[in-house]
Curated annotation (Swiss-Prot):
Alphabetically ordered keywords of this record: ATP synthesis, ATP-binding, Cell membrane, CF(1), Hydrogen ion transport, Ion transport, Membrane, Nucleotide-binding, Translocase, Transport
Source species: Ligilactobacillus salivarius (strain UCC118)
Stored InterPro entries: ATP_synth_asu-like_sf, ATP_synth_asu_C, ATP_synth_asu_C_sf, ATP_synth_F1_a_nt-bd_dom, ATP_synth_F1_asu, ATPase_a/bsu_AS, ATPase_F1/V1/A1_a/bsu_N, ATPase_F1/V1/A1_a/bsu_N_sf
Function summary: Produces ATP from ADP in the presence of a proton gradient across the membrane. The alpha chain is a regulatory subunit.
Name of encoding gene: atpA
Record: residues binding ATP: 169-176
Name of the protein: ATP synthase subunit alpha
Site (Required for activity) location in chain: 362
Similarity-based family: Belongs to the ATPase alpha/beta chains family.
Record field: transmembrane: none
Domain of life: Bacteria
Pfam families named among the record's database cross-references: ATP-synt_ab, ATP-synt_ab_C, ATP-synt_ab_N
Catalytic activity: ATP + H2O + 4 H(+)(in) = ADP + phosphate + 5 H(+)(out)
Complexes and interactors: F-type ATPases have 2 components, CF(1) - the catalytic core - and CF(0) - the membrane proton channel. CF(1) has five subunits: alpha(3), beta(3), gamma(1), delta(1), epsilon(1). CF(0) has three main subunits: a(1), b(2) and c(9-12). The alpha and beta chains form an alternating ring which encloses part of the gamma chain. CF(1) is attached to CF(0) by a central stalk formed by the gamma and epsilon chains, while a peripheral stalk is formed by the delta and b chains.
């Protein structure tokens, strides 16, 4: 049998053509400790802070502590499949989450994985969870209002698009209700809402989602949930994941409202991780960089300049206080980062004043510039009315022989408190808020009994919807008050038809 050189060369060429170089170089280390949501590994000498690493079982982790001998890693998910001695390799990537319109209407975990049983989220866009906040020249001042639908907020502590407004109060004072009502009120406002539930019970999150769905608000809302049974790393990452999802819309010229409910639990999760990673504890055992934990998150909320599309992200961070102590470490940190705070008072809540907003300690540092002109006009005296009422109320309990001016202030104060009450999940459009506050500040409610205020208000709205829709539309479209003669005449017309209760 003769060997032909051509056949051999053809065979060698074919072999060379089919050869694939599948050699890859991975930098791998060895797990030396695993437990409590963290792992330690040595051999990853070139790992970067915040870099994703992959364990043998496919679980990902994030490098946090870079020490001379080993790397402290927080594990993103269950750590049950990871053993001491397993290998762990660098990925060269930082953590990213899925983003885009496909997430709207879904409930996802902080990794962007759906947990609502409605199938996978079909998006191929991702964004890093950590991103540098827009700089000074990339922003513009807050000029557009964000209507919450709650009279007490829109009149006394107005919020603008791009603002950070802290909602602070003890547990069970209606903080989550403020968030849900604000989201419901964004319907038809060209706003995308993101509700980040951190450490909230799964049953509570489910109730909130059902409420949003009932009012049609899930059509423009993303819910990011990290329940109390989630590992601490997921509770720590949840707000950053929500911010990354919001930035996708903000940088595309859209308006976003993001609610962090609540950042106290995120700080607790971060404290837990830091102590397990053996970082030195500081005040209240929080690590030294707990201020930076919240500042780098909240600075990502902004009103972007027109060159960048003019989009905005408004943040409503929540903080839970213990026995009304706003001077604790985390509350004072977040108060100093945000553009104002809404303080919810448990005494007011239990006395039936809901939403339980304390007008004396609540403030909005930039929202006044964004307030509708009509609202600014009618709400101008509200804060002073409430302040003088609360001052006089304590004196009034000791005696009834008060002069007429004091009695008038007390009567106006009682009616102001009553007008600012609002039922759950019934946010009001701004024109109706302006209408009832106009009636209050111009003395039309002074002859009405305090118990009749809310029925009077409901009747007034129905009457204007039926007979004076043009006046309401004028407020809604122009943001200014109609001619006072017309408005006064219309309110007097209604007052003549109002039937007071027989009490």
């Amino acid at each position: 049998m003769s060997i032909k050189a051509e056949e051999i060369s053809a065979l060698i060429k074919q072999q060379l053509a089919n050869y694939q170089d599948e050699l890859t170089v991975d930098e791998v280390g060895t797990v030396t400790y695993v437990g409590d949501g963290i792992a330690r590994a040595n051999g990853l000498d070139n790992a970067l802070a915040g870099e994703l690493v992959e364990f043998d079982d496919g679980t990902y982790g994030m490098a946090q502590n870079l020490e001379s001998n080993d790397v402290g890693i927080i594990i993103l998910g269950s750590f049950k499949g990871i053993r001491e001695g397993d290998t762990v390799k660098r990925t060269g990537r930082i953590m990213e989450v899925p983003v885009g319109e496909e997430l709207i209407g879904r409930v996802v975990n902080p990794l962007g994985q759906p947990i609502d049983g409605l199938g996978e989220v079909k998006t191929n866009k991702t964004r890093p969870v950590e991103r540098k906040a827009p700089g000074v020249m990339e922003r513009q001042s807050v000029t557009e209002p964000l209507q919450t639908g709650l009279k007490a907020i829109d009149a006394l502590v107005p919020i603008g698009r791009g603002q950070r407004e802290l909602v602070i109060g003890d547990r069970k004072t209606g903080k989550t209700s403020v968030a849900i009502d604000t989201i419901i009120n964004q319907k038809d406002q060209d706003m995308i809402c993101i509700y980040v539930a951190i450490g909230q019970k799964d049953s509570t999150v489910r109730t909130s989602v059902e409420t949003l769905r009932k009012f049609g608000a899930m059509d423009y809302t993303i819910v990011v949930s990290a329940g109390p049974s989630s590992p601490a790393p997921l509770l720590y990452l949840a707000p950053y994941a929500g911010a990354a999802m919001g930035e996708e819309f903000m940088f595309n010229g859209k308006h976003v409202l993001i609610v962090y409910d609540d950042l106290s639990k995120q700080a607790d999760a971060y404290r837990e991780l830091s102590l397990i990673l053996r970082r030195p504890p500081g005040r209240e055992a929080y690590p030294g960089d707990v201020f930076y934990l919240h500042s780098r998150l909240l600075e990502r909320a902004a009103k972007l300049s027109d060159e960048l599309g003019g989009g905005s992200m408004t943040a409503l961070p929540f903080i839970e206080t213990k026995a009304g102590d706003v001077s604790a470490y985390i509350p004072t940190n977040v108060i100093s980062i945000t553009d104002g705070q809404i303080f919810l008072d448990s005494d007011r809540f239990y006395s039936g004043i809901r939403p339980a907003i304390d007008a004396g300690t609540s403030v909005s540092r930039v929202g006044g510039n964004a307030q509708v002109k009509a609202m600014k006009k009618v709400a101008g005296t509200l804060r002073t009315d409430l302040a003088s009422y609360s001052e006089l109320e304590s004196f009034a309990q000791f005696g009834s022989d008060l002069d007429e001016a004091t009695q008038a202030k007390l009567n106006r104060g009682r009616r102001t408190v009553e007008v600012l009450k609002q039922p759950l999940h019934k946010p009001l459009p701004v024109e109706k808020q302006v209408l009832i506050l106009y009636a209050l500040t111009h003395g039309f409610l002074d002859p009405v009994k305090v118990d009749d205020i809310l029925p009077y208000q409901d009747g007034l709205f129905d009457y204007f919807d039926a007979n004076h829709k043009d006046l309401l539309d004028e407020i809604a479209n122009t943001g200014k008050l109609p001619e006072t003669e017309k408005l006064d005449a219309a309110i007097k017309e209604y007052a003549a038809t109002f039937q007071a209760s027989e009490k």
